[in-house]
Swiss-Prot record:
It catalyses: fluoride(in) = fluoride(out). It comes from Staphylococcus saprophyticus subsp. saprophyticus (strain ATCC 15305 / DSM 20229 / NCIMB 8711 / NCTC 7292 / S-41). Na(+) is not transported, but it plays an essential structural role and its presence is essential for fluoride channel function. GO terms for molecular function: fluoride channel activity; metal ion binding. The lineage of its organism: Bacteria, Bacillati, Bacillota, Bacilli, Bacillales. It comes from the Bacteria. It is found in: Cell membrane. It is a multi-pass membrane protein. This is Fluoride-specific ion channel FluC 1. The keyword Cell membrane applies. Coiled coil: none annotated. Belongs to the fluoride channel Fluc/FEX (TC 1.A.43) family. Its main location: membrane.
Length: 118
């Protein structure tokens, strides 16, 4: 029961952070590529890898921080909807391909780098 509460609280925090970062970025910059989601997924993937690599044996780290906060922060449902928008917008196929490669490739590498730091 405690773990469910930790995941719920962490997920709420992560989702609020994601929404805030996205809103602030979009107010300051005008770009057709959804850069905030890319940055959030890369940083979140790095943090997840870092915590995994540290092999922390603290009971609340995984449910609250990794699954909760970082899981709520790095949402691939947002990524999927952005990819559909790019794919279904005329003349955006190149951005669709670029964004797909950046999201999956760079997020994976960031997670791997975080893991191997420890």
């Amino acid at each position: 029961m405690i773990q469910c509460i930790l995941v719920m609280l962490g997920g709420g925090i992560g989702a609020v952070i994601r929404g805030f970062v996205t809103d602030v970025f979009n107010q300051k910059f005008n770009t057709s590529l959804p850069i905030p989601t890319l940055l959030i997924n890369v940083v979140g993937s790095f943090c997840i890898g870092l915590l995994m690599g540290m092999c922390l044996n603290i009971n609340w780290i995984n449910p609250f921080i990794i699954v909760g906060i970082l899981g709520g922060l790095t949402t691939f449902s947002t990524l999927s909807s952005e990819l559909v928008k790019l794919l279904t917008t005329p003349k955006q196929i190149n951005l669709f391909i670029l964004y797909s490669i950046l999201q999956y490739g760079v997020s994976f590498v960031a997670c791997l780098l975080g893991y191997y730091l420890f």
